[in-house]
């Protein structure tokens, strides 16, 4: 879709160049939702549907259930990018019916440089190794090799052991929390901040509906987003600026980047108030 992170666009484009695959993109409508009519009209003949669960720019959750149902009705498999969605709510891959689901540790209190791909059994049995070396082999001779039949056939070489241990600890911690309760608490903070930003003359990108994520992307009509980031950083406030690795979506919105405030389990309403206090001070001084 036009909402995808670059990581769900770039390599498909590389494969299209290498093997002639046809790529089709589902557009975003003016209300920031996907054009589901266009999706249904363009899915014929597709083999794989790749879709982000929740936009890392807008925080808007896509209608995943409908997307998966329509894909399966047309014989296509579904790869769900849950890097942004999984840290904020409990996602049951089996109930959704997704064939594959991708996660990233750094979005859920874990280390950088490690992620995972969950695959259902039917899809897993059809997947072949894509990288050679190390423990992914069963036997090796000078004439040829055979490969492990379990998940190890995809894990060539020395794995990221320290990162995996760190992620396990993070998942154990998150498992002690009620993520659905945390989601509602953080969504309340995001809604409050979004309303305050609008009252200060900001344009806020996102809806913050019940199923959406607690990220708030915004722009000031005159003060550049990078200036905001530096000025907030000097006050001890961390925000993200730029295109957020989602340039096609930003192009659709007609902008080059936003300021993004991301609220997670360690944030409180007091943090939000402090952020707004610093932001008001910046506006008084510079805008």
What does each of the following model-derived ranges do?
Residues 1-287:
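Pyridoxal 5′-phosphate
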